[in-house]
Amino acid sequence: MKMSRLCLSVALLVLLGTLAASTPGCDTSNQAKAQRPDFCLEPPYTGPCKARIIRYFYNAKAGLCQTFVYGGCRAKRNNFKSAEDCMRTCGGAIGPWENL
């Protein structure tokens, strides 16, 4: 009798774990998208100045942070000094380092 109760308890725990994992509210990728600022969706903006500064932007189509050449003035908000700042603000992974 004790063995059948133990088996039943284990089966219920496995079932509850499976149900909890498949619940839509448990999808953290949707939560990250909902918390991403709108400016993360903007394309990279070089600006009118002529400097050639490597910066990072969040590429919403690719879902990762990539480099671009920034001219040095009139920066928009999807312009980060480091890949870590880009990822912290907009999420995603660090992508290929080639310029777009």
Curated annotation (Swiss-Prot):
Instruction: Write the record's keywords in alphabetical order, separated by commas.
Output: Disulfide bond, Pharmaceutical, Protease inhibitor, Secreted, Serine protease inhibitor, Signal
An example of a Gene Ontology cellular component annotation for this protein is: extracellular space
Q: Where are the transmembrane segments?
A: none
Gene3D superfamilies tied to this protein: Pancreatic trypsin inhibitor Kunitz domain
Q: Please indicate if the UniProt record lists Flavoprotein as a keyword.
A: no
Q: Which GO terms describe its biological process?
A: negative regulation of platelet aggregation; negative regulation of serine-type endopeptidase activity; negative regulation of thrombin-activated receptor signaling pathway; trypsinogen activation
Signal peptide start-end: 1-21
**Main location group:** secreted
| Subcellular localization(s) per the UniProt record | Secreted
Which molecular-function annotation in GO is an example for this chain?
A: serine-type endopeptidase inhibitor activity
* Site positions per UniProt: Reactive bond for trypsin: K50, A51
InterPro entries in the record? Kunitz_BPTI, Kunitz_BPTI_sf, Prtase_inh_Kunz-CS, TFPI/VKTCI-like
Stretches assigned to the BPTI/Kunitz inhibitor domain: 40-90
Please list the disulfide bridges: C40-C90, C49-C73, C65-C86
Name the Pfam families on file: Kunitz_BPTI
Q: Which residues form the propeptide?
A: 22-35, 94-100
Superkingdom of source: Eukaryota
Role: Inhibits trypsin, kallikrein, chymotrypsin, and plasmin.
Question: What name does UniProt use for this protein?
Answer: Pancreatic trypsin inhibitor
Top-down, what is the taxonomic lineage of the species of origin?
Answer: Eukaryota, Metazoa, Chordata, Craniata, Vertebrata
